[in-house]
């Protein structure tokens, strides 16, 4: 998945109108909550066929960290 596609998917998951980037800090997003985490895990597992665990997602600080989990 390209970075641009990933950012678009994350914007959909977070339902944000403001632009996000790979440098966006997750703790600064009110929309980053347990529902968003579950949605991210489902998207990651479906898109990459790789098992992504909630524990790893909770340790992420930025959008880039979430993207790196897909590799």
Model-derived regions: residue spans:
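Phosphopantetheine-dependent thiolation modules in NRPS/PKS and related acyl-activating systems
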Residues: 1-42, 47-71
